[in-house]
Amino acid sequence: MTEIKKLTKIVILYYGIAGVLFAFIYLVFTNFQLSTWPYDDPVSFWSLGNSLLVLGIASFFAYFKSEWEHIKLYFEIMLMWDFGSILMDIAIVVVITLPEVWVFQMILNFVLLIFNLVIGLYCYFKQRS
């Protein structure tokens, strides 16, 4: 069994905090989000908030594990979620005409997701070595 490295633990904790924080924004401040979004569909915001909440809580569970093998699948799912979200953000910006405030938010999301993916991949490959 391989012990989880300190940086990986920090990244898992970061994923948890970020997941719960963004889940709170999407679940609680849905009306604020919808006020500038081009489509009136709260369900998509709730679905995103729910998935972020689940991933955030799973991060906290993973943080308290001590063996890499116990959290490897979770970590791979997080990396796939980041990658899929990056592709989705690109598609949204290309396909939908967004107000300027949302273009800025999508760019910010893109930067955060790239950061998440890069640091996650770094930890993943360091953990395997």
PLM feature spans:
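Membrane-water interface at the C-terminal end of transmembrane alpha helices
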Residues: 111-129
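Non-cytosolic membrane-interface motifs at loop->transmembrane helix junctions
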Residues: 35-44, 72-74, 98-109
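Juxtamembrane "helix-exit" motif on the non-cytosolic side of transmembrane helices
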Residues: 27-35, 64, 90-98
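Core segments of alpha-helical transmembrane spans in multipass integral membrane proteins
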Residues: 17, 21, 42-64, 77-87
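Cytosolic juxtamembrane helix and N-cap/initiation of the first transmembrane helix
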Residues: 1-18, 125
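Membrane-interface helix-boundary motifs at transmembrane edges
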Residues: 1-7, 64-72, 97-100, 128-129
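Membrane-helix boundary connector in multi-pass membrane proteins
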Residues: 68, 87-106
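Alpha-helical transmembrane segments of multi-pass membrane proteins
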Residues: 19-29
